[in-house]
């Protein structure tokens, strides 16, 4: 069991200038170990955490040594424990987390223990930002109208979260309409350095959203984890992680005139994807750092999941301190942060000579080489230089269906869909823009690109250009500060004139909450099989995510979103072709509306002020009248309503006893689905709209829910019945068992029937037959969606055999008791001749002590084939989870024993 901290003699006082002390801290220099000076800054944060939390039980002295010896130990894939300083949630992932906590309290109660042991031990911040939809756009009243609809749809969920904020200690809930979680985290919640009862330590955070990495731009170590892992971290469990390699990314030079931070991040994303950084930290350094504003850094850090890294880390320097002052942190706080980080060798001062850090590998980018670009049409790392966009688009129309292809026959490529839009003649072609959204924390946190977009709108208005009325335009800032500086600059009216009215403060289009297109537009697209485009300043553009009818989705900077909205198509060469005709009848080109870097800098300087941040965040937890009027039950145990279609008691702990179920293999399982590469968590557990013919729709209709009130899958994650039916329900699912047919169906192997995935799974379960899933590379990439593991578990899936897994998803599968297995290098289902019509036996020992992390096992089929796979339990702790039937039963049993 836990002992006292062996490093207590390293506890040192941090003096205040002018007398007194800021507090005590665990001093890295007092260890007198020269290896620490060579460590990357990101690894120093892990080291400090290990020293501070060392109790020779959860965190051992040898763990500290592994981190100090990072240079030698990181290539060996060693495991370390990490205890983050706090946990961050948003409402889509927060609702199921609070449901699980409430359910764990019930389980503790039933097992005769104290249910109040289930309480967050670290600060938990939950920001409600994922529920607002763009129902109303292009209207002065859009914010209010969308918020009223948001509350009508989500009243029950919001009341449940409000109950949670009262029932659990240490939990702050930021009400709807306040902003996007990662931007609120950057501008307000991020501490950089904690001072808890006189103990100083670096802020660090894990969040149930993959873009938690945005906070890395502020020098705070943070990354996305599954909801299941986050719940364990809240309850004081150390997170088990492999000590990561760190890629050193050197930046030099400065961005050319007219090039944006978004162009830079799309370039960095492509470079890092190519380099291969999955499971690694990326740490930025070099002279170019001084040219990047903190918002630019946050934009790059935000997209870590898109380049595949665990973190994209920017150590704290003078730029960070300036930003902390700008965003209203007090002078006293900023001086404590600087003093602590300097004293503990965690501050970078570019005015001083830099000691060489050691990195696992190195990359370099001269900022002057970055050129304007966008990414798409289906993946964030498929970057296209702006000057090549037209030719790339035509290649995409020609290419066979794939990440860069739509397979439109040559004779159909010039088709025009003519229709009437509210009485006025309108037309759509392949590439016509039907959604243009300035959205997402990635970019709305960055004043230079937001004000850049407003300047494009202003120039367009002055020249007489106008966005066509059938383009669904929207602006959804990540915090109220954006509204304040857009108004202060006098530029918001120009955005309004082009249809970019503010529609709400939340994720909106970036996560698929784009709302309906006008019926006439939808019909024109569907009836004529048009490949319509969405252009958004988001961070993800996977198929079917932004809107079911936009097959081409491009990520672009906010000013480019406005430019493409004005052009009305992505089928344009901005260098050579005019965007439109001005009021004088002359052609207007891209160069005529594009602002210079100097113009943007001037407006940023005069419009973005510290008071805006102070006044916005002083009132953030006060909520709004609709939030304040929500009535919630009191009591620390939740009263489940069996008729609720939003909040339902899940079955995870139904028959739980104090005895773990133990390890087990899989015998004679059928294949539920057979996939190729790049199956995302969006494919496994979609967040967007509930299709009218889906099993989830049938369930809701049977319970008296109108179609208009279905809401989204994301909003119903507190109901396991809906979510089990929504598992593998993505309309773009490609399952090899269906021989080329696209859609959320599968073949029930014993009968050969074609059924919905849910119906097939139920059939297997009622016959007592286990199932597995076959997959290709990058299985589970995308959002850190714990329902992508919970759902398959509820469907009876016992194992997933893939070429490779995305980091968060693999740990989520383990957390739910599903076995992740990898084919051997160079092998996959196709090369082994597996069709998915076989039965599979996985030969795993029944005794957990006989299983090692990463060991090989034999898989045999009833057709006589046998092959070797690697079991992806990566750590001893993960084996303990598996033995217990998952991470949450493990935590409950441990808490009862304490």
Swiss-Prot record:
The record's EC number reads 4.2.1.3
Do the record's keywords include Iron?
A: yes
Give the EC class as a word: lyase
Q: Where found in the cell?
A: Cytoplasm
Q: Quick check: keyword Thylakoid in the entry?
A: no
Tell me which residues bind [4Fe-4S] cluster: 441, 507, 510
Q: Which cofactor does it need?
A: [4Fe-4S] cluster
Checking CDD domains in the record gives: AcnA_IRP (cd01586), AcnA_IRP_Swivel (cd01580)
Superkingdom as given in the UniProt entry: Eukaryota
Q: Which PANTHER family match?
A: ACONITASE/IRON-RESPONSIVE ELEMENT FAMILY MEMBER
Designated name of the protein: Aconitate hydratase, cytoplasmic
Q: What is the lineage of its organism?
A: Eukaryota, Viridiplantae, Streptophyta, Embryophyta, Tracheophyta
